[in-house]
Amino acid sequence: MPFKIIASQCTSCSACEPLCPNVAISEKGGNFVIEAAKCSECVGHFDEPQCAAACPVDNTCVVDRALPRYQAPV
């Protein structure tokens, strides 16, 4: 499942944006968003999702359970 950013909790510090290996995080209208189609949960790059690890606000970068889990290409 890709991650999403809870806009109401995001401080727009941008700590997450440069860490995303898939360039899935961008700023739109003053808020940071994760493009679900690009998010791989950092599988194959890191042991844990970098957006969640870098975010200074707990539970702001979270799994978007409404979308299917990322599957690495075979």
Curated annotation (Swiss-Prot):
SUPFAM superfamilies: 4Fe-4S ferredoxins (SSF54862). Its cofactor is [4Fe-4S] cluster. It holds the Pfam family Fer4. GO terms for molecular function: 4 iron, 4 sulfur cluster binding; metal ion binding. It comes from the Bacteria. Keywords: 4Fe-4S, Electron transport, Iron, Iron-sulfur, Metal-binding, Nitrogen fixation, Repeat, Transport. Residues 2-30 form the 4Fe-4S ferredoxin-type domain. GO terms for biological process: nitrogen fixation. GO terms for cellular component: cytoplasm. Binds 2 [4Fe-4S] clusters. [4Fe-4S] cluster 2 binds at C20, C39, C51. InterPro entries: 4Fe4S_Fe-S-bd, 4Fe4S_Fe_S_CS. [4Fe-4S] cluster 1 binds at C10, C13, C16, C55. This is Ferredoxin-like protein in nif region. The gene is frxA.
